[in-house]
Amino acid sequence: MWNKDKMGAVLLAAGYSSRMVKCKSLLPLGGLRVIERGINTFRQAGIMDITVVVGHRADKLIPILDELKVSYVFNEKYSEGMFSSIVKGVQSLPAETKAFFLLPSDMPLVKSHTVRLLGRAFNKVKADIIYPVFQKHRGHPPLISANCFPEILLGNTSGGLRQILERREGNAYEVEVFDEGILLDIDTHEDYQKIMTGYYRRDIPTQAECEAIFKKMNVSEAIVNHGRMVAEIARNLALRLNEIGLNIDVHAVTAAGKLHDLAKGKPNHAQIGGRILKKYGYYKVAQIVAAHTDMELNEKALPDEAAVVYLADKLVKGGGIVSIDERFSASMDEYAASAEAVAVIRERRLRAEKIEQTVEQLLGISLVMAARDLC
């Protein structure tokens, strides 16, 4: 748990959206509007004191904000630029506010877990500014302490908020996050398309997020390389299965293949890895990772994402492709002295052989030969 008391959020939605025909805040995204996604991010993190600064096209935004029961303030100086909206937003904050999150309304992919991480850091370190960082790049929303409010409210700096925050760099703190959304905004139609793609894959880490997770958790190079090989086999198996009419999520199996041994070395590493990914909001991939050692197998069902990753993992040992027999014979030899371990290995082998048989029948190929061709 973390102390959300006296923390607020300011969303900036007063600008012109000059490079877009439509108001960016009102663009549709997953059945809601872009601005609703940002509001929901804070609400899901437990931040309820939210103010939206409106200006250009306020007449379109205000009815929606009323419907959402979100506070708003009108910036009559919106033509002067973003800093005027920031000043207006800070003016609207309750006097007892300790800090506020600042988010442009056209950044709808920020994860609620990122907001929680920033809040926890603020409670711990008491910095003037807490920045989320992804792959060494600072993004939004920064969490800005009340210590900065007087200088912001003067509103007379030519350098805007950036200049104010730069003067306080000595008391800034960075929080590394697995959230590429902190860097993604909507400036162009191409950006909007990327945002839409990211939204529909929001429970699947991007390639960059996978690499950030590896780095943060100090995953060994051997495990990273194993994961990349499993991911490549899983991806190509999924593509081939989809060609004959299945509907395997290629992006999900690729990410899960990479990350399946994230917690390798810990007891019940599959379940632990799944819990870690679930905590960061990657629910779909978390389920696949959690099942990669032991999964429920419906022999009458067609292979799904979990089955594809389970099988791909069993076809890789060390840095090479092996058969199911080779993979499990080595394990049987290693744990021959433990009857309990041997029973578990036999169960896993039987499961892998059944999946392999189903896939080979569907594709009409030898899976080991295909795997060697695919890598």
Regions found by a protein language model. Give the residues of each.
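Conserved alpha/beta core of the MobA/IspD/sugar-nucleotide pyrophosphorylase nucleotidyltransferase superfamily
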Residues: 2-5, 156-208
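A short, N-terminal amphipathic alpha-helix
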Residues: 34-49, 88-92, 233-240
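Charged phosphate-binding loop/patch that engages nucleotide di/tri-phosphates or the phosphate backbone
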Residues: 185, 197, 341-375
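Conserved donor nucleotide-binding strand/loop of the catalytic core
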Residues: 67-80
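Conserved beta-loop-beta/alpha segment of the NTase-like Rossmann-fold superfamily
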Residues: 79-151
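Divalent metal-dependent catalytic cores for phosphoryl transfer on phosphate-bearing substrates
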Residues: 238, 243-335
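N-terminal glycine-rich phosphate-binding loop and ensuing alpha1 helix
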Residues: 4-55, 59
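Active-site flanking loop/helix segments enriched in acidic
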Residues: 207-227, 241, 256-262
